[in-house]
A protein has these predicted regions:
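Hydrophobic pocket/interface hotspot
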Residues: 20, 30, 54, 72, ...
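Hydrophobic ligand-binding cavity/cleft-lining segments
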Residues: 1-40
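Beta-strand/loop substructures that line and gate deep hydrophobic ligand-binding cavities in soluble
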Residues: 80-132
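Glycine-rich portal/gate segments that line the openings of hydrophobic small-molecule binding cavities
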Residues: 42-84
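Short amphipathic alpha-helical signal-transduction/dimerization elements
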Residues: 134-142
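Structural motif
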Residues: 14, 75-77, 104-106
Length: 142
């Protein structure tokens, strides 16, 4: 049995867990930072409860739209989010994202694990995308 590729990213933010968590669950806040580099989030919908759904539509600089959606599997306010992640273009390639938010003095230690990728190329693209998004989140919550 082969294991599907995964990635784990850790980052410290100079903001309390409640502020960082809210940036992930409030649609208006999500629009301000989600997406790497010059990618813009056009649509953000979020119902952050177990069984609730979310949807994000991002537009890349070339004008192409990227539609992602999923279901929240676990929501512990200011501590943990677990949700499925599927691109509209390849819904059969659903993956799973787990984010933990831990208090660190006046800041937050965030650990993002994204697993069950279709292949290593998909993992590598997502790693680049998540790193770019987390850089924007860092500026947003500062």
């Amino acid at each position: 049995m082969s294991t599907k590729p995964s990635l784990t990213l850790k980052r410290r933010f100079n903001a309390p867990p409640a502020k960082v968590f809210s940036a992930w669950t409030d649609p208006e806040k999500l629009k301000r930072w989600m997406g790497p580099g010059e990618v813009k989030t056009l649509i953000a919908e979020s119902d952050p409860r177990s069984g609730g759904r979310y949807r994000i539509v991002m537009r890349s600089p070339d004008g192409e739209d990227h539609d992602i959606s999923g279901v929240y599997r676990e929501v512990i306010p200011n501590e943990k989010l677990v949700f499925t992640w599927a691109w509209k273009s390849t819904p059969e390639r659903e993956s799973l994202v787990t984010i933990s938010f831990k208090s660190d003095g006046a800041g937050t230690l965030l650990t993002l694990t994204h697993e069950q990728f279709f292949d290593e190329a998909a993992r590598d693209r997502h790693q680049q995308g998540w790193n770019g998004s987390l850089e924007k989140l860092e500026k947003f919550v500062a």
